[in-house]
Amino acid sequence: MYKNFDVVVLITCFWRRENSITFVSMKTFVIVGCGRLAGIVSEAVVKGLLPEYELVGVYSRTVAKAERIAGEMEKIGKSCAVCTTVDGLLALKPDILVETASPAALREFAIPALKNGTSIVTLSIGALADDSFYREVCETAKENGTRVYIASGATGGFDVLRTAALMGNATACFFNEKGPDALKGTPVYEETMQSEQKVVFTGNAVEAIRLFPTKVNVTVAASRASVGPEAMQVTIQSTPGFKGDTQKVEIRNDQVHAVVDVYSATA
């Protein structure tokens, strides 16, 4: 069983994309970033959970990590290229590029990938908080007949959020509860948080992802599905002894009030 909620959502992105239409051919995909999350995606291939997809290439700045995943494919009789550059990866002409690296990586290769005719499934949604980059990505995808699939991460209900936002006059807020250990290494961490509950951040989604570039991608995902990063108000709370993550998105307009409240045991 897969215990990481983000990865379950990522695998579901694949399943939903193809199971809503008639299959016509095998799709090829590549992975950028070969850490723990990429390993879980490749494991899904090995276990036959993505039967309509073939992993044909991997890229990582740590070559040994890419070689490990390619080795797993070799064990099941599949060829998977270990690429030393993103250009080399795109030369494989994959249908889809799966990004499990970082927002910086997405900024680096998103436009070249889309121009290559390669759609993207990304976990590093935080990069899309930048409006100019977001617009460039959307325009490039449209011009090249490609798409960017945003994994919802540790929340959901994006269809509801989108509907409420399109109705007009909507406001939205995002509440995230974490344990203090999950915030170690960030600018807000203090030892007192181990014994005292504390609100460590209030602001919008743009400010949140700037301060926590790898911790709150989900706030940007929810904001892009609704009111936008500038308008999405974010509160992050640290609670002593708390394990996992609580993500609660709330949206209101003149006619609708919706709440999506999800707890995940793995932060």
What are the language-model segments listed below?
Residues 125-145:
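Rossmann-fold NAD(P)-binding glycine/threonine-rich loop
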Residues 84-115, 127-130:
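Beta-loop-alpha module in the N-terminal Rossmann-like domain of NAD(P)-dependent dehydrogenases
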Residues 99, 122, 148-152:
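General beta-strand structural signal in soluble alpha/beta enzymes
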Residues 32, 40, 149, 154-267:
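Active-site-lining helix/loop region of Rossmann-like oxidoreductase modules
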